[in-house]
């Protein structure tokens, strides 16, 4: 060991930061008149809710991941029994004459799970919407974006279908029609979208929702030709998927 003090710097820095944050919170509680008064005034509850909201946003944007929920979902997972809605939206148990508001229980994955359940309920009556990959062009990019898109849409419980790619637009269009795609995801490199995406859109726009995987520089030109849907790493995944549910009548 060359520098013991230097090696402990990271732990000491974290410890100091935690202590400073804890002391700041302690003083804020004291300003409310103590912990009990802080509870009665809703100060503690507001702080907890603010933390929950920040975490909800991080989960929706996949900055915080739950494997199997908002990242790497099981494409074939099915719910085999009825579920109580209280799992996704806990009841408010605060009594009418209570002095202190009761906090609801919190689970980070709940919003994604509720969204997926909504698709499952719809699928039981109408069939599960198919999201079909339309890979074309650069092999590495189309495979990477198809994988990203499959993972993206499976989070909402859609049936995702991938394939090895197409040599022509007509070949891809035919496959989409044969698979009765509700959503078609164009998967390619940024540079190649301008060359085939408008043609694919024109031939499929009356049959399915057309989505571009990525956020290419040519997006303004593509939007001018009608391509308005894009999925990429900066999306709020939860809100995007809810939007596609609405478009499909779910």
Regions found by a protein language model. Give the residues of each.
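Long, amphipathic alpha-helical stalk/connector segments used for oligomerization, subunit docking
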Residues: 1-39
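Short glycine/threonine-rich loop-to-helix capping motif typified by GTGT followed
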Residues: 10-25, 46-59, 141-147, 175-179
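Flexible loop/turn segments at secondary-structure boundaries
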Residues: 11-12, 36-37, 46-47, 138-143, ...
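Intrinsic disorder at enzyme termini
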Residues: 24-129
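Short, glycine-/Ser/Thr-/acidic-enriched flexible segments
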Residues: 43-44, 71-89, 136-139, 167, ...
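Generic long, charged, amphipathic alpha-helical segments
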Residues: 121-186, 193-204, 211
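Peripheral docking tails and interdomain loops at the edges
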Residues: 198-250
């Amino acid at each position: 060991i060359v520098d013991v003090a230097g090696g402990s710097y990271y732990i000491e820095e974290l410890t100091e930061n935690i202590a400073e944050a804890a002391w700041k919170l302690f003083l804020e509680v004291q300003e409310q008149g103590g912990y009990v008064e802080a509870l009665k005034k809703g100060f503690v509850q507001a702080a907890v809710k603010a933390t929950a909201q920040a975490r909800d946003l991080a989960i929706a944007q996949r900055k915080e991941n739950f494997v199997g929920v908002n990242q790497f979902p099981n494409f074939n997972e099915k719910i085999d029994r009825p579920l109580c809605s209280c799992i996704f939206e806990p009841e408010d148990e605060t009594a009418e004459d209570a002095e202190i508001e009761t906090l609801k229980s919190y689970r980070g994955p709940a919003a994604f799970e509720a969204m997926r359940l909504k698709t499952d309920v719809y699928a039981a009556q109408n069939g599960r919407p198919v999201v079909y990959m339309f890979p074309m062009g650069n092999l590495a990019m189309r495979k990477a974006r198809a994988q990203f898109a499959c993972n993206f849409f499976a989070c909402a419980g859609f049936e995702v279908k991938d394939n090895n790619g197409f040599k022509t637009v007509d070949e891809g269009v035919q496959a989409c029609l044969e698979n009765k795609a509700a959503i078609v995801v164009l998967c390619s490199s940024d540079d190649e979208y301008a060359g085939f995406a408008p043609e694919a859109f024109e031939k499929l726009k009356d049959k399915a929702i057309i989505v571009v995987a990525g956020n290419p520089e040519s997006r303004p030109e593509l939007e001018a030709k009608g391509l308005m849907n894009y999925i990429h790493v900066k999306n709020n995944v939860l809100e995007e998927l809810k939007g596609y549910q609405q478009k499909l009548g779910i």
